[in-house]
Structures are given as structure tokens and as C-alpha cells.
Amino acid sequence: MSTSVFNRRWAALLLEALTRHGVRHICIAPGSRSTPLTLAAAANPSLVCHTHFDERGLGHLALGLAKASTEPVAVIVTSGTAVANLYPALIEAGLTGERLILLTADRPPELIDCGANQAIRQQGLFASHPTLSVNLPRPTPDISARWLVSTLDSAMAQLQHGALHINCPFAEPLYGGDEQQYADWSASLGDWWQDCHPWLRQTCYPPSLYQPPAQQADWFFWRQKRGVVIAGRMGAQEGRQLTAWAAMLGWPLIGDVLSQTGQPLPCADLWLAHPRAQETLAQAQMVLQFGSSLTSKRLLQWQTACQPQEYWLVDSAPGRLDPANHRGRRIICPVGEWLSRHPAQRRTPWATELAAYSESAQAQVIETLAGQFSEAAVAHQLAELLPDNGQLFVGNSLIVRLIDALGQLPAGYPVYSNRGASGIDGLLSTAAGVQRATAKPTLAIVGDLSALYDLNALALLRQSSAPMVLLVINNNGGQIFSLLPTPEAERQRFYCMPQDVNFEHAAVMFSLGYARPNSWPQLRELVHQCWLRGGTTLIEVQVPPSQGAETLQQLVQQVTLIPQVAP
């Protein structure tokens, strides 16, 4: 009897079991040891297969697919260092909640620790970062199909957040054999193969910390007080819902760039530095934070220092999510569900002077950036580039801070990012996954080092299903470090690390469109044409290295001098 055939039977059951739990997309890297899994995925009509030659990018592609689809996404890689390349995406998923199923092919146990090629210790490789781990045995007909499918169903039922690592050892041979062999092993599951449900329908009742949110008994008391709403990362519908809810209460809403609330008080990173604005906020009796991953330095400083009578943090992700460790309540549930259970009561706004500080800060930004074609100016006017019925992917480091501080995105407009661990690795790959999951026109904006870090992911952008623009802000290095008190003598060499590159040849190498505009009207027209033309275009905006950081620092200083507004 053929080992290769039974390997494929085993893998086919594994993949079919995953589809019963909503897995629709699967990302595959090349490799021989993963052959049973790859062939099973290719043969399964319920799966959409995505391929990439770089496992690090592949993991981030899956991450982007999971972000935008809100579905679990599977990944197949071969044994050895291919597995380790999934680590960054796995870490990000653990922090931001996307469900990834990492199917890592492995050598059988007898080939580990004996000098066999491409054999490493894969069990436990990811330490505590996966939410769950399953180490499957080497496939053998002595193990029933019922055991395998039940094991997978149990693991998938428990996976509510983060990644599931399934290590899959396969012995050789991996190819050939009579496909009719071992049919009885698969047939032992009867009509399950024609069904659409899991073999084992396991219901997980979570511990009390994760129970669906009962209404906070004292909410009717606290909603009559002076409150402040902080909006972190959340979905588009949640952002719209929260904006209306806070407006009904008359509570000021300070929205992060990822909140999708429309940022009713824009330029918060600037006006929060004003001492009078801080005095107003200090009168809040309650602070309610929805979502995490706050971007603004000034907002984080105020969030750390504030001392309300009550501090509540609502987010569906587990964990404390409050680096300041406030005394209060950590409510683990979806933002929209919590808002529905805790209705607002129409009240007169209590901190109206904050709107005046916000308007003054925005006016200062407009005046300072008038006529400029700079990193800060692009961040400020970014909303003008967004496609209708599209989406935005925002990179990390300086650009996301500038957009947060100087821009104002439309309420409910989908915004995606990797702000869990906030790394610059895999940003282009993640953006590619976001676009593939939704098939929407997509604007992605990153810095030059981020683009260089994930340059081979340009291969993933060649076949976009809707128009896509990759906007690379080339400030020649990691200029985020210009905002930090890094030693000036060593800053360029050891922190910013300028590379003196342009991206024209990279775009040509991967058959992408390319443009390098020299003015804001030219950039705006180019982007507009891209939405009409289709395909993927890399647009490079070359800017002076430290101008963006210097402009932000200058504006913060200017806004602190705005005259006091009468309450």
C-alpha cells in the first residue's frame, strides 16, 4: 500500500474539515514536503488558492485576507526555515485577532535531530504566540478518520482570536501511487463528505471574563456625567455607530486614524498639547475607550495621565490593552454589541471649546502647508485621493502618525493596518491580501523603507482584481527617528539609514505602472486616472528627508500658542 496515497487522503480530510469552519482562502508556498496539503487544497472546490514564493510575505498575505474578510485563512508551507518565516504574521495576528491556520509540513519524527536535510524542531517553534497548537502524528491508517476530523473540529471551535498552528509530519514517498487505495478509510465518515457541517459541532462556553456583555448596571448613572470617548482601532460600521452614539451623549470623541469615526475633532495630536484643552479634559468624570492601538503621541500621553472617576475599555480582543493600567473596567466584547446594549441619552455637549481648539489647529495646518508638496501635505489631503467605495491601507512609522495628526478620513471608510506589533515587515503583502479579500479599489500608503523591506511582495500586486495604487512616500530612510531624541551625530547612519533609491525599476521588474509626480495637482490627477484605468500603479513621492517630522514638531508648538477659548 502507498504511503503517498494515504498522505493525500489524510491531507484531503484535513482541508475539508477546515472548510466546514469557514476557511475559504488558503495561501500556499512552494515545497515538496507540503505536497499532500498543496494537492488537497488544489483539489478542493471550496478553497481559493493564493500562491507566493516568499513565506514571510505569504503569512502577511494571509493576514490581510483575514483582516478584510473577517474569516479564518489557512497557510501551507514546507518544512524547515519556511516555517520560521511565518513568525511575524503570526505575532501580528495574535495581537490584532485575525484567525490564521498555519499548516506546516514537517519531516516525520525519525528524521528529527539526526542530520536529515531541511528537518528542524517545529513542534513548539512559535512558543506562546499561537492561540492553539496541534501536533498531528505521522499519517497512518491505524488512526481513524474520525479521530483526525474530531481533533480539527475541536481546535477550530476554540479558535476565536489569533492563530492555530497545525504541524503536519509526512513520510516519503510523497508522489504517485494508486488513488483508489485507502478509499475505505475516507469512506468511514459516510455522508459527511456530502454534508456542509463539521463532524463534531463543539460549543465552547468561555470563562466568565469573556461572557457576552450584560448591560453595566450603573450605565444609566454614568451616562449622565461628563465623559470623554477615545476611539481606537475598530471596524467601519462600529466607527459610524460610535460617532452617532457619542454625539447623542454630548461627549467629545477623540478618534484615532484607524477608528473610522471620521475624527469629529481632527488634529487631536496637535490640540491635545494645548494646556487649556488639557484642563477641559481633566473635568471628565468618565473616560470610555473603544478599541486599542492608539497612534497619537499626545493622545497616549493624555490617556496615561488622565484620572477620571471611571475608566472603561471596550474591545473584543482579550487582554488588558491599557498600558497605563487604569483602575476601572475591561469589557471584552464587540464594540457594536456593547453600544447597542448601552443606549445613549441625548444631552447638551459639555466640552464645546474642544471643537474650537480643533478648528484652530486644522486652520493652522492648512495655513502652514499651503502650496507645499510634502510628506505632511500628502498626509493632510489624503482623503482627496481615496477611491469611491474603496478602502485604505496605512503603513507604519512616520506616515501613519502624520495622517493621524494632520488628516481627517471619512466616517465609515474602511481603513486597515498592521498596528498590533507595528512592524514594517510585510506591509505590502498585507495590503495585497486586503485587496484580494474584498476586490475593492485600494489605496495603500507606506514609507520607502517599508516598501524596500517587502519589495518582492510587488509580485502579489500584479493581478489585482480592482484598481490599486501603492503610494510610496520616499523620505530616504526611517525618518520616524527624527521625532525621537536619538543622538544627532549617529542618527542618519544608525537610525534613519538612508538608502538613496527610487522605485521605478522595481515597478518595471514586476510589470506595474509607475509615476513620480512633482506637485499635488499632478498627484491627485494621477491617482484619479488610476481608479479609472485599473491595474496596480506604484506612485513614488520623493520628499526632503526630515521635513515631515520637522513640520509635525513645528505645528505642535504653534498650536500650543493658540489663544484660550472661552468655555
From Swiss-Prot:
Give the keywords, sorted. Answer: Magnesium, Manganese, Menaquinone biosynthesis, Metal-binding, Thiamine pyrophosphate, Transferase
Q: Which cofactor does it need?
A: Mg(2+); Mn(2+); thiamine diphosphate
Q: Name one GO biological process term.
A: menaquinone biosynthetic process
InterPro entries in UniProt: MenaQ_synth_MenD, MenD_middle, THDP-binding, Thiamin_PyroP_enz_TPP-bd_dom, TPP_enzyme_TPP-bd
Q: Which GO terms describe its molecular function?
A: 2-succinyl-5-enolpyruvyl-6-hydroxy-3-cyclohexene-1-carboxylic-acid synthase activity; magnesium ion binding; manganese ion binding; thiamine pyrophosphate binding
Identify the domain of life: Bacteria
Catalytic activity reported: isochorismate + 2-oxoglutarate + H(+) = 5-enolpyruvoyl-6-hydroxy-2-succinyl-cyclohex-3-ene-1-carboxylate + CO2
> Gene3D superfamilies, alphabetically?
3.40.50.970, TPP-binding domain
Q: How is the cofactor bound?
A: Binds 1 thiamine pyrophosphate per subunit.
Enzyme Commission designation = 2.2.1.9
Q: In which pathway does it act?
A: Quinol/quinone metabolism; 1,4-dihydroxy-2-naphthoate biosynthesis; 1,4-dihydroxy-2-naphthoate from chorismate: step 2/7; Quinol/quinone metabolism; menaquinone biosynthesis
Q: How does it assemble?
A: Homodimer.
Q: Which family does it belong to?
A: Belongs to the TPP enzyme family. MenD subfamily.
UniProt function note: Catalyzes the thiamine diphosphate-dependent decarboxylation of 2-oxoglutarate and the subsequent addition of the resulting succinic semialdehyde-thiamine pyrophosphate anion to isochorismate to yield 2-succinyl-5-enolpyruvyl-6-hydroxy-3-cyclohexene-1-carboxylate (SEPHCHC).
Query: What is the protein name given in its UniProt record?
Result: 2-succinyl-5-enolpyruvyl-6-hydroxy-3-cyclohexene-1-carboxylate synthase
* Native source species: Yersinia pestis (strain Pestoides F)
